[in-house]
Amino acid sequence: MRHCFPSNLRRTLEELPKSLDDTYKRILKEINNANQVHAYRLLQCLAVAGHPLRVEELAEVLAFDLSEGGIPKLNADWRWENQEEAVLLACSSLVTIVTDHDSQVVQFSHFSVKEFLTSDRLAHCIEESQFYIPIEPSHAILAQACLGALLSLDHRTNQYDAWQFPLYGYATTYWVGHARTGNVELVIKESLDHFFDMDMPYFSAWFRREFTWELSTDSVQDDSDVPPSAASLYFAAWKGFRGLVERLLIKHPQQVHHLGGRFGTPLHASLQEEHFEVAQLLLAHGADINSRCGRNFTPLHFASEIGHLKIVKWLVNHGADVNSQAAHGHTPLYLSSTRRHLDICRTLLEHGAAVDTLVETGSTPFLEACRFGPTDIIFLLLDHAQDVNVRHPEHRDDTPLHWAARRGPPEFAKKLLERGAEVNLLNSHNYTPLLLASQYGQSGVVRLLLDYNAHWYVGAHDENGDTSLHKSVGHGHIEVVRMLLACGAGVNSPNNLGFTPLHRAARYWTPSPHALDIVQLLLDYGADVRARNSSGKTASGEAFDGGHHEIVQLLSHHPAE
């Protein structure tokens, strides 16, 4: 406008575009005919790129011959010496170049540029519609360019050198995403087949460079530097390329049973990202739904452990063995219950999973739920348990009722007792459920156990001679102390070291705001203040040694003291 003569100013203003759409149309018209093909390709790439593309990455796209349906080939003669000039010359003012972490990144000059280029408004323009960018074909362009970059390198190129190629890093990270968009897989079929051909060096070299972690697992027994023969089928199944999987199965039918990577077989891999059509195809070609891989896991073991309900349902509906045992005897139900996957536990039980199957440690899914699980899983498995008095040999021979007494809630213990749990079973440390509930202050469980006749064994003691009353006073659980005293607990019963409950209250294990009240309560029930333990000390002496001077003072006022 600065260069306009005053007499031409009004006409110039009138000729300015009336909207952004008009502005972009004018820019598109100004693109040189010789540059239109390159400009369109670069705009397509910018519209669907997985991350902002660097100048050299976009310029490299121009160096590929992407003839429709063919295998992309890099033409070194098409590379521009001045890559920034190549990009700007092709795309005019629709794009801009910015510096980002020492890289020159190409982006649309405004977010509205992409919106316009992909809009129906441009698609229905008479003159500029050839610049309309449909999303799926644009992904196909980038997928082809990415595969072209991967096909440019073979087994002689190591990982470091590969990442020096302009488009290699982007291709490795994003080619799958572009190829899986819509029907792009069909468009790039020839390129995919060429890349995944295990008789050619390309896929094996790329897999070895970028997926060494896939080769260093107990699922793959081959030389860790060489991809297994089923690696291409495994990867195609993992990423959901159904058409490619079908062609590979026809070409190499035996590979459906082979291990291909860390997930195991192609069937294992297909289920990782819910590619059920691919999984169904693999089953139709003879894949074993109970095939094994690392840790002797079947696909159902994997899905049950990670908590993938949709996959679990698909597997059980297709005949997966719900009671199959993996390493250490773990079943799918054992894994799902220890990982707290309630819906998966329910699904497995609906299909016949056993809650009492023993694993190597002697535990069962039901016992593990009692030890660690939330109450909803415990109750679910309890409804299917055959033996509610089963013991855990590696955990003190505890029964489910021991765990309920330790953890609560009372509803857990109540359900066990209603199912016939024995109230006074001893574990290997001579603990009854009442002893444990008293130690952990589970007053609701204590009350329930007493209602179920545990009071007949209120004087039972553990391997140290401590009774339930010793446990409750030593940990400051005053409500439990009251209940035990009310039902006749021995207030002067000594343990193996001669400690009476009063000794233990005076020299408690756990500080409690109720310490003085507990001592007074024991005195009210006739505790002997003169009783001495095996060290010859009275309760007052133990309190003094423990620095509990308020208790010493309380005991000193007792008449017998």
Residue ranges and their predicted role:
Residues 431, 439, 457, 462-466, ...:
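Eukaryotic tandem repeat interaction scaffolds
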Residues 247-255, 280-288, 313-320, 346-354, ...:
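Ankyrin repeat domain, specifically the short helix-to-loop turn at the C-terminus of the second helix
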Residues 529-561:
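Leucine-rich solenoid repeat scaffolds
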Residues 240-257, 265, 269, 273-277, ...:
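Cross-kingdom leucine-rich repeat
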Residues 235-240, 269-275, 302-308, 335-341, ...:
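Ankyrin repeat A-helix N-terminal signature
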Residues 243-244, 277-278, 310-311, 343-344, ...:
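Conserved ankyrin/ankyrin-like repeat signature
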Residues 225-233, 258-266, 292-298, 325-331, ...:
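Ankyrin-repeat boundary/"N-cap" motif
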Residues 1-258, 265, 269-280, 284, ...:
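Leucine/isoleucine-rich amphipathic helices and adjacent mixed helix/strand linkers
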